[in-house]
Amino acid sequence: MNKNSFSGGLRKRRTLKKDKKNLPLVSIITVVLNNKKFLEQSINSVLNQEYKNHEHIIIDGKSTDGTVEILRKNNSKIDYWISQKDRGIYDAMNKGIKLSRGSLIVMLNSDDVFYKHALKIATSYFNRYKNIDF
């Protein structure tokens, strides 16, 4: 991390999540750039999941609209977030993937929300069909 970036979240406090028996860790990656209008709804949809063994990683492309303030406000609810200039959405997604620790990786756009059963359903299929790539 350089002087032109900010970061935070539970990992900064050395709180790491991992797979549990029959409960794979799901890494949820959200990429955002100047979308403070919807970001908090997206964060809350992750927090409201029935399936709790997940981590939320948010990669911000150095927003200027107040997005970082939303991230700071939710610092204790997000596993890891960083705000730094990137080379576009795919660069940001790749950063998120490199930071992920889960057996499953899910992309959640910053203006989207999860239905509360989404991760529970996805992980049940993941556990049931071991030979299928999702």
Predicted feature locations:
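Nucleotide-sugar donor-binding/catalytic module of glycosyltransferases
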Residues: 1-134
